[in-house]
Amino acid sequence: MLDIKLLDIIACPLCKGKLSYKKNSNELICKFDHLAYPVIDGIPALLKVKARTISSDEE
């Protein structure tokens, strides 16, 4: 589970845009780059190699 306060200070490492949290999949979503970054043990894994590409209907 992610501490929601982190959403105010973290950004997508690629585009520097805002991230949103998807609780059911425990991922941070970048709508601009269409990437989902996993949150592992409460820690965001903001590395492109850890991200998965998402379709527009998943956002």
From Swiss-Prot:
InterPro entries on file: Trm112-like
Signal sequence region: none
Pfam families for this protein: Trm112p
GO CC entries: cytosol
Family of this protein: Belongs to the UPF0434 family.
Protein name: UPF0434 protein Ping_0902
Source organism per UniProt: Psychromonas ingrahamii (strain DSM 17664 / CCUG 51855 / 37)
